[in-house]
């Protein structure tokens, strides 16, 4: 009687090269360290499609969550893996001397090196903002009243008289900032559209973390040492003010970013309202 051998292991499904590298990177940099894989080896996460190429479907390169947009020796720009708006990217410094510092402390430094770093971050964030603004115009310009003349020329419905009309300034719809209490260990700047329209925005904390003082915008830096959004060790006075968001706004009322309507803790009602506001915002 033949003896039974050990069952053969089931073959693992074969993914693409990007998937394999990404999985390996995620195993090395897990949880709060996950952004480290982009800093460590950004070329592994570029994917197969580059900016400016023609997408195979309605999604463009800027909608590929978790992929790198661009990088150099000093910074990496990536698509947020869990975008909370129509376009949402992260800017990651690559300098190991600073990338584990608290972003509020780092961007509030007033010494020469701190000023130089903050200026470099602002320059790179503006570049990323321009990229995202272009993506907003590409996606939503056809709906915008301010882009009507430009879109008519692009469609061939109007003659081009001189230069192509600039149309809507979509860069004004893009916000840049860092969280007062970041969820990831590596310094990362959020660069995102203000519409807050995404299936990945699933609860109150998500919404309030981007629409309250918990998000410190880049043009607010440097913060004063006693600003309540500073880490406790840095502050020179008392505890957190009720006007800040140490808990990412878990207990704050949710207010529409566009009209200011207060939804209290009624998240699903807010989501339905944001769908309506999104359509109106596109048409401005």
Which residues make up each language-model segment?
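Active-site microenvironments that recognize anionic phosphate/pyrophosphate groups
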Residues: 1-108, 112, 229-284
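Histidine-centered divalent-metal-coordination microenvironment in nucleic-acid enzymes
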Residues: 93, 175-196
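Aromatic/acidic cage segments in peptide-binding pockets
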Residues: 92-97, 105-115, 192-219
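Intrinsically disordered, low-complexity domain-flanking/linker segments in eukaryotic proteins
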Residues: 107, 134-169
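Long, charged, low-complexity intrinsically disordered regions
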Residues: 131, 141-151, 209-236, 240, ...
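Intrinsically disordered, low-complexity regions enriched in proline, serine, glycine
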Residues: 80, 88, 100-103, 137-145, ...
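Conserved, structured regulatory domains from eukaryotic proteins
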Residues: 153-167, 173-175, 186, 192, ...
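Short histidine-centered catalytic/ligand-binding loop motif
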Residues: 90-144
């Amino acid at each position: 009687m033949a003896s039974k051998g050990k069952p053969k292991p089931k073959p693992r499904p074969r993914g693409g090269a990007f998937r394999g590298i990404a999985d390996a990177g995620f195993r090395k940099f897990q949880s709060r360290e996950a952004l480290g894989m982009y800093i460590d080896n950004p070329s592994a996460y570029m994917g197969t499609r580059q900016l400016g190429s023609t997408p195979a479907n309605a999604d463009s390169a800027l909608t590929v969550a978790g992929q790198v947009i661009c990088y150099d020796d000093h910074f990496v720009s990536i698509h947020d893996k869990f975008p909370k708006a129509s376009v949402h990217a992260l800017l990651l410094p690559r300098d190991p001397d600073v990338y584990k510092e608290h972003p509020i402390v780092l961007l509030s430094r007033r010494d020469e090196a701190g000023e130089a770093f903050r200026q470099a971050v602002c320059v790179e964030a503006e570049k990323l903002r321009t990229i995202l603004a272009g993506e907003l115009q590409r996606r939503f310009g056809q709906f915008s009243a301010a882009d009507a003349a430009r879109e008519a020329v692009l469609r061939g419905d109007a003659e081009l008289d001189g230069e192509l009309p600039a149309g809507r300034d979509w860069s004004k719809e893009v916000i840049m900032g860092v969280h007062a209490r970041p969820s990831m260990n590596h310094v990362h700047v959020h660069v995102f559209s203000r519409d807050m329209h995404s299936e990945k925005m699933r609860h109150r904390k998500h919404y309030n973390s981007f629409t309250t003082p918990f998000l410190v915008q880049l043009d607010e830096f440097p913060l004063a040492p006693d600003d309540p959004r500073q880490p406790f060790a840095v502050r020179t006075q008392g505890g957190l003010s009720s006007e800040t968001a140490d808990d990412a706004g878990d207990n704050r009322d949710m207010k529409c970013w566009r009209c200011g309507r207060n939804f209290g803790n009624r998240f699903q009602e807010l989501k339905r309202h944001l769908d309506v506001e999104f359509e109106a915002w596109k048409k401005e």
